[in-house]
């Protein structure tokens, strides 16, 4: 019964799993922009 419910749960979290690899890149870009903004002052 639990195994039959897994696909439904996966469909709910699928978008989050697709976005997860992009999050570290966004953090790197945010850190780079922040350092650039502080450096330009």
From Swiss-Prot:
Keyword Magnesium among UniProt keywords: no
Q: Where in the cell is it found?
A: Plastid, Chloroplast thylakoid membrane
- TM regions (residue ranges): 12-32
Q: Please classify the protein's predominant subcellular localization into one broad category.
A: plastid
**What kind of membrane protein is this, topologically?**
Single-pass membrane protein
Propeptide at which positions?
1-4
Entry's InterPro entries?
A: PSII_PsbK, PSII_PsbK_sf
Q: Tell me the Pfam families matching this sequence.
A: PsbK
Q: Name one GO cellular component term.
A: chloroplast thylakoid membrane
Q: What keywords are assigned to this protein?
A: Chloroplast, Membrane, Photosynthesis, Photosystem II, Plastid, Reaction center, Thylakoid, Transmembrane, Transmembrane helix
GO annotation (BP), single: photosynthesis
Q: Which family does it belong to?
A: Belongs to the PsbK family.
Please explain the role this protein plays, according to its UniProt record.
One of the components of the core complex of photosystem II (PSII). PSII is a light-driven water:plastoquinone oxidoreductase that uses light energy to abstract electrons from H(2)O, generating O(2) and a proton gradient subsequently used for ATP formation. It consists of a core antenna complex that captures photons, and an electron transfer chain that converts photonic excitation into a charge separation.
How does it associate, per the subunit comment? PSII is composed of 1 copy each of membrane proteins PsbA, PsbB, PsbC, PsbD, PsbE, PsbF, PsbH, PsbI, PsbJ, PsbK, PsbL, PsbM, PsbT, PsbY, PsbZ, Psb30/Ycf12, at least 3 peripheral proteins of the oxygen-evolving complex and a large number of cofactors. It forms dimeric complexes.
Q: Which NCBIfam families match?
A: PRK02553.1
Q: What is this protein called?
A: Photosystem II reaction center protein K
> What gene name is listed for this protein?
psbK
